[in-house]
């Protein structure tokens, strides 16, 4: 859990560097500072009660928010003339962090406030949300071009170097599932 929180904290300077470097995307100041309280809250609650399942799930939410922000900023930067490899990686990172955020929130809400699953339905919902995380790597094998989440600027089709042509009939299903998960956010 400490490593996850450190990844979230490391995403902060990545976001700032991508925005503040020459040619960076124009974003609001609130986007740059919004993830800071998430990292601070995650660190504070984890320092106080690292054994608590509720705290660990909250740490996951707090760590994924700055990672998702960094992925979105990197995608905007890559869309403005960046290299295609970075654009592909940024789209996959954005999908992964959005689905990870949904999973972390579902996991937290399922056990809040007691720290245990109170019904089998809650456990089933967390397992279903965890399965949705598998959509991201599956999308890497079936979709070409990759579907991108909505951004400030329209993106050109993003070529996927990992796509397997034989799996392309599954592409609309996976793209729809990724879109459904992103609509939950």
Over which residues does each language-model region extend?
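Alpha-helical transmembrane segments of multi-pass integral membrane proteins
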Residues: 1-185
């Amino acid at each position: 859990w400490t490593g996850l929180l450190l990844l979230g904290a490391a995403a902060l300077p990545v976001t700032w560097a991508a925005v503040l470097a020459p040619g960076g995307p124009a974003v609001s100041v609130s986007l740059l500072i919004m993830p800071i309280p998430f990292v601070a809250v995650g660190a504070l609650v984890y320092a106080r009660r690292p054994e608590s399942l509720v705290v660990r799930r909250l740490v996951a939410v707090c760590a994924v928010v700055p990672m998702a922000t960094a992925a979105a900023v990197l995608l905007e930067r890559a869309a403005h003339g960046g290299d295609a490899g970075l654009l592909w990686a940024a789209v996959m990172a954005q999908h992964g962090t959005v689905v990870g955020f949904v999973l972390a929130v579902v996991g937290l809400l399922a056990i809040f406030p007691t720290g245990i699953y109170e019904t089998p339905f809650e456990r089933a919902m967390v397992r279903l949300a965890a399965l949705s995380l598998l959509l991201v790597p599956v999308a890497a094998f079936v979709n070409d071009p990759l579907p991108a989440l909505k951004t400030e600027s329209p993106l050109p089709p993003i070529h996927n170097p990992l796509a397997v042509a034989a799996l392309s009939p599954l592409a609309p299903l996976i793209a729809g599932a990724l879109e459904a998960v992103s609509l939950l956010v």
